[in-house]
Amino acid sequence: MAVIGGEPMNNNEYFINGKEKSKWSNIRQEINLKSETAKSKGALALIIFDEYLHRRYSYRYKYSDSGRGGKRMELGNEESNNFQVLLFSENHKEYLSNDNLKFNMNFKKDVQTFSADNVAAIFRGSEFPDEYVILTAHLDHVGIQNGDIYNGADDNGSGTVAMLEIAEAFALAKEQGHTPKRSIVFLHVTAEERGLLGSEYYADYDPLVPINKTIANLNMDMMGRADPNRGIKNLNYVYVIGSDILSDDLHEINLEANEKFANLELDFRYNDINDPNQFYYRSDHYHFVKNNIPSIFYFSGVHEDYHKPTDTAEKILYEPYKRRVKLIFHTAWGLANRDERIKLN
């Protein structure tokens, strides 16, 4: 079965919901929905033609083929033998215009299995201990290549160390008689560099706490440097990605925490599901978002040492980094200590 990405347009409106996209053209949902529907109707195979997804996946595969990110991996499950993606030219209309289209595919798949651990701790809340705020940071990097150690100080030492500092701050607060109302899960996820696998496993297959009791996710990934694209202007900034996409409450709590405690410039330039850089889909918060959990990805930007041995600790900018960690702590506290659970949009 061949299907087109998105949904039909009718007089410049979406076919199902008019001005708004439906789930059938939502990048977080459409592939699974269309695959499941095709399977239920007896389809043996599915080919999806989608220009937008081509741009997204072609970047991913070019990066993988460069050798900097390693080979693609996926979780071992019943769908592991599926193609993840089949790339055609972006101009796929030529394929669809031929009523007698035929093509042949030959492929060989070399499958290897490995295991890796997520590492978690739970800080119990005082009044609503069965509701959870999850903090995430990936603990892996790209290892040793051609004898060079890839240190990963920013990617993602900055996120893992931030989480440990925040965990210590919660523990100290409890010692002083201050415990937030909800519980906090500190989750170091594995295999982010191999395709967000640790967070996918947690969110989709084996969560420690119920997904429907998880009120928000705050994700820390590459937050210790400065983006050269910003020039030499204010270094006391952080990119905030996803804060208002699922919950305006989450967005407002983050703004308030920043105003009171961190005084950072909150830069929302990448807070767009259609941004060509696709940062919204490229870190571990994404697997929480697709499960309808409001999430923020805190990020300071890509730099010249990204996935190189030169990503070392002395290049971390500790003053803005400290402010970013402070912002995340107070946002987590604000989420956990509210009288009411934050609302979805």
For the regions a language model picked out, list residue spans one by one.
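Active-site metal-coordination/substrate-binding segment of hydrolases
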Residues: 1-2, 15-26, 134-172
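Extracellular/luminal Protease-associated
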Residues: 1-76
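Structural recognition of the beta-strand scaffold that forms the well-ordered cores
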Residues: 1-4, 44-49, 84-87, 120, ...
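Second-shell loop/turn segments in exported
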Residues: 15-29, 33-35, 81-86, 106-110, ...
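Soluble metallo-hydrolase cores and metallopeptidase-like ectodomains found primarily
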Residues: 72-152, 168, 172-176
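His/Asp/Glu-rich mid-to-C-terminal helical/loop segments that flank catalytic regions of hydrolases
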Residues: 86-87, 168, 299-345
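Metal-dependent peptidase/peptidase-like ectodomains
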Residues: 128, 189-297
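Short helix-loop-beta-strand segments that form the rim/entrance of peptidase-like active sites
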Residues: 168-195, 220
